[in-house]
């Protein structure tokens, strides 16, 4: 009980500091926030040796825990990935400041003038798993949008996240912004997660970024509002009017470019009229690339079971199924999908339009790799996750999605009749 009490006190203190920092960030200048992010980017690159050394400790921890190759890939940092973190910080720094943006304005016959203006949410709690770059992405986006943030990274990335967090704090310090604007939970103890989820006095929204287990835990236990990021059970429907070369290129990229990200394809749905030719070619190409294909009605593959539909592999495995038409594909996706990202490959615009109209995934694609399901690829610089719910934020959650709004009403001694 003593440990739990200590964690409770620690989390309460983080919450108090975050709330105080949020009050200052709400009116921080765009220039100061940009300077903090540029300073953080410079610090990340200057300290890349320290970050890689910290990451080596996490990789050893991951090996000892028996993490899967996909999880180890998510965890690993090298100079190229650190350069990606630096680039992401600089991109967010150079974006327009969303705070204070006038979303709409109008005059009323009564004589009042009304503006709807973007405002920060306040304090955001971000809970994520093994990918340490989320520390930088989440910290940057929350700062850009004028929010304080409490980061709770996965136990696997504890040391990497700490090293990156130190760089973010260095940027805040250099820019004269409150260092408590970006805080990292200083323990691996899971009790800290439970505390964070119930801190209604200090936290305005929780953003979970991870697998089904994490998101389910957050949705069950949270008393704070949640932006849900469900797993990416990503489908690609190959229509009978698909261009074979486009289909092959898109499918191979969507599955094999990086298997451990939420935009990786996990299930192919192939029109029955092309199953014996293009379908067989796709299966053959995937197998030759080292992908295990679990299929129904396609030669050369392993037999699929019911458990393969609706499964996020995050690995060199893909499910495949022959379907009658686009409506059968839509029905399958509705039953087994996660409303994350789904794609149609076709040259028939009517089929593409039907796919877009009849599905309600956060991201729908036509003749493009599902690996574009990423805030950076959407021009957001970085993302805090892909929101699959229908309230407030949906799709890639960038800085603008981490704001609310308020109404500014101006008169001239105006009174209501």
Curated annotation (Swiss-Prot):
Question: What InterPro entries would the database entry show?
Answer: Ald_DH/histidinol_DH, Ald_DH_C, Ald_DH_N, Aldehyde_DH_dom, G-glutamylP_reductase_CS, Glu-5-SA_DH, GPR_dom
Keyword Transport in annotation: no
List, in alphabetical order, the GO biological process terms annotated in this UniProt record: L-proline biosynthetic process
User: Where is it mainly found?
Assistant: cytoplasm
Top-level class of the enzyme under EC nomenclature: oxidoreductase
User: Which GO cellular component terms are attached?
Assistant: cytoplasm
Q: Which domain of life is it from?
A: Bacteria
Looking up Gene3D superfamilies in the UniProt record yields: Aldehyde Dehydrogenase, Chain A, domain 1, Aldehyde Dehydrogenase, Chain A, domain 2
Q: What is its EC number?
A: 1.2.1.41
Report the locations given in the UniProt record: Cytoplasm
UniProt pathway annotation: Amino-acid biosynthesis; L-proline biosynthesis; L-glutamate 5-semialdehyde from L-glutamate: step 2/2
Any one GO molecular-function label of the UniProt entry: NADP binding
Please write the reaction equations for the catalytic activity of this protein: L-glutamate 5-semialdehyde + phosphate + NADP(+) = L-glutamyl 5-phosphate + NADPH + H(+)
Q: Which Pfam families match?
A: Aldedh
Which keywords annotate this record? Amino-acid biosynthesis, Cytoplasm, NADP, Oxidoreductase, Proline biosynthesis
Instruction: Return the similarity comment.
Output: Belongs to the gamma-glutamyl phosphate reductase family.
Per its UniProt record, what HAMAP family does this chain match?
Answer: ProA
Provide the function of this protein: Catalyzes the NADPH-dependent reduction of L-glutamate 5-phosphate into L-glutamate 5-semialdehyde and phosphate. The product spontaneously undergoes cyclization to form 1-pyrroline-5-carboxylate.
Query: Per its record, how is this protein called by name?
Result: Gamma-glutamyl phosphate reductase
Lineage of the species this protein comes from:
Bacteria, Pseudomonadati, Pseudomonadota, Alphaproteobacteria, Rhodobacterales
Q: Which gene encodes it?
A: proA
């Amino acid at each position: 009980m003593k440990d739990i009490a200590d964690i409770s006190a620690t989390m309460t203190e983080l919450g108090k500091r975050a709330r105080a920092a949020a009050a200052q960030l709400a009116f921080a200048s765009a220039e100061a926030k940009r300077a903090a992010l540029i300073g953080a980017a410079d610090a990340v690159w200057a300290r890349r040796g320290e970050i890689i050394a910290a990451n080596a400790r996490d990789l050893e921890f991951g090996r000892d825990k028996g993490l899967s190759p996909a999880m180890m890939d998510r965890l690993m940092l090298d100079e190229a990935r650190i350069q990606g973190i630096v680039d992401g910080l600089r991109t967010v720094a150079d974006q327009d400041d969303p705070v204070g943006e006038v979303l709409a304005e109008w005059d009323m016959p009564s004589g009042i003038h009304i503006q709807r203006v973007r405002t920060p949410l306040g304090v955001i709690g971000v809970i994520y798993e093994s990918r340490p770059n989320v520390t930088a992405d989440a910290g940057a986006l929350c700062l850009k949008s004028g929010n304080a943030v409490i980061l709770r990274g996965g136990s696997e990335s504890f040391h990497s996240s700490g090293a990156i967090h130190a760089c973010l704090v260095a940027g805040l310090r250099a820019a004269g912004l409150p260092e408590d604007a970006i805080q990292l939970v200083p323990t691996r103890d899971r009790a800290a997660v439970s505390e964070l989820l119930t801190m209604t006095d200090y936290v305005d929204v929780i953003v979970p970024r991870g697998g089904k287990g994490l998101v389910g835990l957050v949705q069950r236990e949270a008393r704070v509002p949640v932006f849900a990021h469900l797993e990416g059970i990503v489908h690609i429907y190959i229509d009978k009017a698909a261009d074979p070369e486009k289909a092959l290129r898109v499918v191979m990229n969507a599955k094999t470019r990086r298997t451990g990200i939420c935009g990786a394809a996990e299930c192919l749905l192939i029109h029955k009229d092309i199953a014996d030719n293009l379908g067989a070619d796709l299966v053959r190409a995937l197998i030759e690339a080292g992908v295990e294909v679990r299929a129904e009605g396609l030669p050369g593959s392993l037999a699929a079971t019911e458990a393969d539909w609706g499964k996020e592999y995050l690995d060199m495995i893909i499910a495949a199924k022959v379907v009658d038409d686009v409506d059968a594909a839509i029905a399958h996706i509705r039953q087994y999908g996660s409303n994350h990202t789904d794609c149609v490959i076709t040259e028939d615009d009517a089929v593409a339009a039907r796919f877009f109209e009849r599905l309600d995934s956060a991201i729908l694609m036509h003749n493009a790799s599902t690996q574009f399901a990423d805030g950076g690829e959407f021009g957001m610089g970085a993302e805090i996750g892909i929101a699959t719910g229908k309230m407030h934020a949906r799709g890639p959650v960038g800085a603008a999605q981490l704001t609310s709004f308020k109404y500014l009403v101006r008169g001239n001694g105006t009174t209501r009749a």
